[in-house]
Structure formats: structure tokens, C-alpha cells
Amino acid sequence: MIKLECLQDPSPRKRRTKLLGRGPSSGHGKTSGRGHKGDGSRSGYKRRFGYEGGGVPLYRRVPTRGFSHTRFDKCVEEITTQRLNEIFDNGAEVSLEALKERKVIHRETSRVKVILKGALDKKLVWKDAAIVLSEGVKSLIEAV
């Protein structure tokens, strides 16, 4: 059973904050732990992350290695047959522009893959070579 007198503070004890500028015997008097002169002694100074006192910082001393392909990667999105059923009418042309106009795909997208999920009841005209159909979708289109 929990008793009122047995309750403990859940947070860990906090270290006492240093009293600054309260005489030489406190250990943090006069310059208040800031040292003499320089940027750090001035009010309002905040050292930026990675700053090493004016020397060449570590991130510039370490050589760059490798290559990142993310800038050049083609953006490919997937779309289901169920979603195409909702968006397009019977006999509509399916192209990247049509999908972008309807805000189904992102404007940066350069390729779309159509995946079989649900039925595709409508006869659609595939206009774009950038739209790739999965094997299941191809067989479904032939059946329709």
C-alpha cells in the first residue's frame, strides 16, 4: 500500500546552480567563470556548434569521401488499380501529367508503377512510357 510519507520525488536531484560574481572566495567571482577577454567573455555570446576557436574545424579537416546519388535519383511512385478506378473515368487517358494535375503523384515524380490491388473496371488509355505496369495489371487489362 502506498503511504503519503513514502512518496519520493520521481525526478533526479538537481545540482545546485553556481552563484556567479559573488566574491573571490566563491570560486566564481569577478569574471564569473568566463575568463579574461575574448568572445566568450562578452555578453550575448553563443558559440556555434562545431566552432573551435577560429582554428580549422573538424568537419573541414576530415576529407570528403564517396559520392551521393540522391540529387540524381529518379523519383518513382506506386499507384494501385483501385486508386486509378476512383480517379479516372471510363476511356480516360492515363499519363504523368494527368496524374500530377489530379495531385495523385508528386510533381517531381518521373516514373509511376501501377500495382494490382482491387479491380480495374474501367477501360483506360495508357499514354505515357513512364508508367510501368506490373505483370498482374497487364493480365487484368488484357482480360478487360
Curated annotation (Swiss-Prot):
InterPro entries xref list: Ribosomal_uL15, Ribosomal_uL15/eL18, Ribosomal_uL15/eL18_sf, Ribosomal_uL15_bac-type
Q: Which GO terms describe its cellular component?
A: cytosolic large ribosomal subunit
**Gene3D superfamilies this protein is in?**
3.100.10.10
Q: Where is this region: Disordered?
A: 1-48
Alphabetical UniProt keywords:
Ribonucleoprotein, Ribosomal protein, RNA-binding, rRNA-binding
Q: Report which superkingdom the organism of origin falls in.
A: Bacteria
GO aspect biological process, one term: translation
UniProt keyword Ribosomal protein, yes or no? yes
Q: Which Pfam families match?
A: Ribosomal_L27A
Q: Name one GO molecular function term.
A: rRNA binding
Keyword Ribonucleoprotein appears in the UniProt entry: yes
Please give the family membership noted in the entry: Belongs to the universal ribosomal protein uL15 family.
**Function according to Swiss-Prot or TrEMBL:** Binds to the 23S rRNA.
Tell me, how does this one assemble?
Part of the 50S ribosomal subunit.
The protein's name in its UniProt record:
Large ribosomal subunit protein uL15
